[in-house]
Amino acid sequence: MEKDKILVAGATGYLGKYITRELLSEGFKTKIIVRNPNKIEFGDDNLIIEKAEVTRPETLKDICKDVRVVISTVGITRQKDGLTYMDVDYRANANLIDEAKKNGVEKFIYVSVLNGEKLRHLKICEAKEKLGDYLKSSGLDYCIVRPSGFFSDMGDFLKMAEGGRVYLFGDGKFKINPIHGEDLAKAVVETIHNDKKEIDIGGCRVFSHNDIAELALNAYSKPVKIVHLPDWIRKFILWFLRKFTNSKFYGPLEFFMTAMAMDMQATPYGKHKLEDYFKNQVNNARKLPRSENECMNK
């Protein structure tokens, strides 16, 4: 029996690559939208590559033809190239939803962010939640997947640990269970055949910020030195950024510094361990020539 055709938007991104590989390994006919086909690093008999840009609706005509499910990881961390969060996280995904409806797509799966409903006052979450509202009112069957954060989002802990000391706001007791992209991809693909409308998901182990700082220092074989900064410093930095910089600059920092002052803990899932990820990152960095290592850490 031939499997359903799935469309992946955002397939060249970190999570999108894992989702595409997972779909292909499960035998799904997989169509991916890319701006530059040359960026695709893998091939498969079931892989269909379509050149299009989700921010330009005229390039999406019939992109969803014969597709049963659309999976979108489209979104930006930093606003660049003249594009805002509203342009990409909301409008580009809304373009896809409109095209999906025209072509009779049955289900739309969107990867958002944990606690986005509580963080609508942040620019990035405002756009993601507006898209979530649009999807819910679209008439399509849908699932909104809300990950707690990726292992790769913990990179700042490693950067500080390399210098021998990790700085945290507050007492470091807020909880988070970040997830590896491969584990999240499996969970996303599983939603194709279940009827859950929203899923909060994180990695297999819950950590405090102190725990993560200790793991990062251990990865560098450094003594555990954690400095706890008073939370008013975090609040002042947020105020300063909003007052004296534009949203293009402060958007990603605004989200990061707000999320660091709340629990970002979700249903545990997966098998990858953060400590293994940290050790691999450190080992890989040590294998690089000095100039390449400096570039990687920027």
Identify the residue ranges that each predicted region occupies.
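Non-catalytic, hydrophobic alpha-helical segments
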Residues: L15, V70, L184, V188, ...
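Substrate-positioning beta->alpha
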Residues: G170-I192, K197
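Substrate-binding strand-loop-helix patch
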Residues: K175-E182, I201-A219, W232-W239, H272
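A hydrophobic C-terminal alpha-helical subdomain
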Residues: D231-K298
